[in-house]
Amino acid sequence: LFFFLGRDYFPEIRSGVIQMHMRAPLGTRIEVSGRLATLISNSIEELLPGQIRNIVSNCGLPVGPHNLAFIPTPTIGSQDCDLTILLENEKSPVWDFRRILRKGLTERYPGTEFTFQPSDLTAKILNFGAPAPIDVQVNGPDMYANYEFARKLVGKFRDIPGAVDVVIQQTMRTPTLMVEGNRTFGLGVNRTLKNMADNLLMTTAGSQQVDQIYWLDPSTGMSYLINVYTPQAQINSLNSLRTVPIDSSVKSPKDEDVQLLGNLADLSAEGTPGVVTHGNIMPLFDIYVSVEGRDLGGVLTDVERIAKSMEHEKPRSAELEIHGQASLMHDAYYELIFGLLAAIALVYLLIVVNFQSWLDPFIIITALPGALAGIAWALFLTHTRLSEPALTGAIMTMGTATANSILVVSYARERIEEHGDAVMAAIEAGKTRFRPVLMTASAMIFGMVPMATGYSQNAPLGRAVIGGLFVATLFTLFFVPCVYALVYSGRVTRQKERAS
C-alpha cells in the first residue's frame, strides 16, 4: 500500500487564504493593470459566491529595490499583480477553489496568466520564497538558446498529470523602445552619445539620474535635492521623444546649435528581457511547476524523467538542475527512513542487552510489521499521502509497539521458567498482559484523535500513530504469543530429548 499512497513533503493545510498572481500581456501599463485587477476581483466574487471576505491587490514594482528583496513575489514589471484572497471560512477547501478560479479566470481573460502560490507559512519557507515547490533551472552562457530550451521543457511539463501553473519566471519579449544614436550625425553637430543619453534620461526619469543638484536654503542652512524632469503627460508618443532637445557639452546661445533626438538617433520597438537572473555569473531561467490533485513525489518523478530525456537537446555548456521543496523532499525521506530503520535496530540491540538473548528480542520486534501495516492502511483509508509528519508518527509507533511487546514476552519468560510449557506460557502472557497493553495503546490512540481529525499539518502524524498502534496492539496480543509458543516449544522439546 505504501506505493499507492503518494509522497508529499508536508501536507497542505486549510489556511483560509488564497494567494494568486496575475500577469497581464507584457508591457501593460500600471494603470491598466490596476483596472484589470479590479475586474478580476469582481470575477472572483462571481465564481465563488458567498465565499470571499476581502481581496487585496498589489500591482507593479515597489519604488525602491530594497522592498522587493523582502517580498517573495514573481512580479517583474507593471503588468504583474499579486492578489490576496481572504475567505469567509478558514476551513474552506482552498485546493477546490483554486481549481474553479484557474478554469474560470482563464476563460474570461484570455492572454492573462494566472498562477497560485502557497498561502501557508510552512510551504513558503520550504519553497525558499519560490512560488512553486518544483523549480527547474536552466543555466548557461547562451541566454537565447537557454530560453528556447526552457520553452520546450514547459511544453513537456504541461502534459504531466497533476502539474499546473507551469511558467517561466523570466520574460524575453518585454516591449521596449530602442534608441540607437548615430555617431556620424552627432559628431557633425558636436554631439556625443553621452549627450543623447543624458538628455533623454533627464527628460524621462529626471535630472537625478544624470547629476544630483542640491539647493541650499540660506535661512535654515539645509540642503534640498532638486529633481527636474518633463511631465509624463508631455512624453506620450514617439514624436514627443523625437523632439527631445539635445544640447552639447559646449554651451552656446545660438539657436542653430539646438538639435533634436530624432535627427541624431533611430527609434525602434523591440522585445527585450524583462528581468535577467544570473547563477554562477551565467544567465539563468526558472521554470516553476506547481502540483494540484496529485502527490508531489509523483509529479517530481515525471519532471525528472522528462528532464533526463531532454538532455540531448540541451544547449552547449548549459546545466539543468531541479531545486525547490521537491529536491529537499528526497533528502528528508532518506533521512527519516534511515532513522526508522536505525530506531528498529537500536531498539533490538538494547533489548538484546537487557534480555541477554538474541531470540527473545527477535520475537518482540515481530509486532513491528503489524505497526507498518496499520500505518499503511490508516493513511490509505483516510486518503492521506505519505509525508514527513507521517514518517515521524511511524517512528513514534515503533517505540510504543515495542514497549507493549516487551511486556508480553517478559511475562512469558517468567512463566516458562516455572512450568516449562511454552504454549501455556504464551497463553498466560496474552491473558495477563491484555489489560496493561490495552490501556497503554488506548491512551495513546485516544490522545491522538484530536490531532488526526484536525486540519493541521500534524494530522498525518496522528493518523499514522492511531492506525499503526491499533494493528500493532493486535499483533502484540495475538501474533507475538503465537511466535513465542512456536519458537520455544521446539526448544523445550529438544532440551527434554537431550536430558533424556
What spans do the regions from the language model cover?
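Interfacial helix-loop-helix hairpins and adjacent transmembrane helices
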Residues: 1, 26-38, 457, 482-500
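Signature of alpha-helical transmembrane segments and their immediate interfacial
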Residues: 1-11, 53, 107-108, 112, ...
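Transmembrane helices with small-residue packing motifs
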Residues: 1-28, 66, 70, 92, ...
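Alpha-helical membrane-interface segments at transmembrane helix boundaries
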Residues: 2, 6, 10, 154, ...
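Flexible hinge/switch segments at interdomain interfaces of large molecular machines
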Residues: 9-17, 74-80, 115-133, 137, ...
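Solvent-exposed, membrane-proximal periplasmic/extracellular interface segments of envelope transport
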Residues: 32-128, 133, 155, 184-210, ...
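Extracytoplasmic/periplasmic membrane-proximal domains and adjacent transmembrane bundles
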Residues: 147-150, 154-343, 347, 352-355, ...
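Hydrophobic transmembrane alpha-helices and their membrane-interface caps
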Residues: 349-433, 438-457, 463, 467, ...
